[in-house]
Amino acid sequence: MTRFIMSLDEAINLVLFAFEHGTTGDILVQKAPACTINTLAEAICELLGGNKENIRRIGIRHGEKMYETLLTNEECANAIDMGDFYRVPRDNRDLNYAKYFVDGDTDRNLLTEFNSNNTELLDIEQVKNKLLSLEYIREKIVSITHRI
């Protein structure tokens, strides 16, 4: 089971990027890395001095997804790669199907959906580094180590 992982600063950067580069109706998606839930649990355990043996694997809850999808196949087909982001412009096509049958649509990308299972997967050290970039986590580590 995988999930995207993004800090608050990265989320703010996405919003600022959208303001600068997006237009009405666009979808903007950051090419965020992901990690498995197990990797996240082990990274937190290591950071907080916990015992990994205490991690319980309870399986998938009813209705829970194995991975998150940020862009579907159709959205990826129209996506514009902007480096660290994808931009999916709003659909401005008209209903003139005759034009489609004459001209076709050869500009469509052939990307598959962008999901947490086919993006960069972080290992335990990378997840720990991302978590340590968060002030809340650093404060929590200090408060726990002072109690011991």
Regions flagged by a language model, labelled:
Residues M1-I148:
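Strand-loop microenvironment adjacent to phosphate/nucleotide-handling motifs in alpha/beta enzyme folds
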